[in-house]
Amino acid sequence: MTFSKIKDAINDFKKGKFGIVIDDKHRENEADLVLAAEKCSPEKINFMIKNARGLVCVPMLGKRLDELKLRLMAKINTEFTKCAFTISVDAKKGTKTGISAYDRAKTIKALIDRNTKPSDLAKPGHIFPLRYNKKGLSKRAGHTEAAIELCRLAKLYPAAVICEIIGENGKMAKMKELKRFAKKWGVRIIKIQELIR
């Protein structure tokens, strides 16, 4: 079976395991490797960078982004899926250049730390927060909203780490390659549409 049951994916997510989330074939038709932000570590971020190969982003609720004064990157969003990137950041404390897996994990942890203030973040940086659509998956069936929904269902802090899965040929990984990836690393695959039901 290609796709896993949502409850099994949630149990894995709760334990700090990765999941693969695929959106609709008529949308981006792409897969992201997803992890709960509170479960991230330098080793897990390094795994994403090395094996998923996409851009490491952090879906977050608007309330927290407002607390950190992280405005949207573009005033007028012309990207076709309306992915809501904020200005990128690095944690100032405990990091060097911000790009290493260690530094990126440190920044992600800082974003979800209630004690982090706007002044604790350098801008621009190497981590890209994404603003969750407050109407959720019913309004925007994207990886950002799906990742936050997984956090909620797993009763974890509502922030995640996502990274697109790019194939060895440099193009977006499709189902055949995703199956191999999932089997090799023991990761479950779910469809966003299953989270909406």
Where would I find each of the regions flagged by the language model?
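Catalytic domains of riboflavin
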Residues: M1-R197
